[in-house]
Amino acid sequence: MGCLILVSGVPGSGKSTFCAKYEERGKVAVFSSDETRKQLTGSYTNFSREKEMWQTLYNNAYTILTRFPEMDVILDATYLSENQRLKVWRNFCEVADDLCLVQFQLDPNLARKQNESREKVVPGDAFDAMLAKFQPVTAEELNYYGSVVIVRNRDTREVLKYGNCSRHIDWL
């Protein structure tokens, strides 16, 4: 089976850019909460069907991991809290060969600036609320993920744990 790569970070931190670059390498399916929400509701900002959105996102990822073992899967969402990230681990730990966490910990001012210059702008007050909820990777999470990478900016990354999945993110 393939690896599951979970990207985490506030809006504008580079998650979707990372996913797009990874997708160019082939043999990967990217499932985005924003894109799934838009497919279901017609809008990135319509949160009326969140439960269905998450079920769809996870079902799609599960299908790829179980039917196409040569494929990797990336889940592109904010995953701001440890609880959110561990829920993903619990759902996929027996399905994926390895799970990798790539967390984007950019300077908040840079992330805010990048958020404001993208198509899917998160309003300032909502961005601030998300920033306040953001939890950096915890020591406990290192026990769960095979690989953990922190991206601080375009030129700086820190590998906290290097496992099987790392072969897929060495190019970062």
Predicted regions mapped to residue ranges:
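Conserved beta-strand segments of the P-loop GTPase G domain that flank and frequently precede/overlap
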Residues: 74-76, 102-105, 150-151
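Conserved substrate/cofactor phosphate-moiety recognition/catalytic segment
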Residues: 16-71, 112
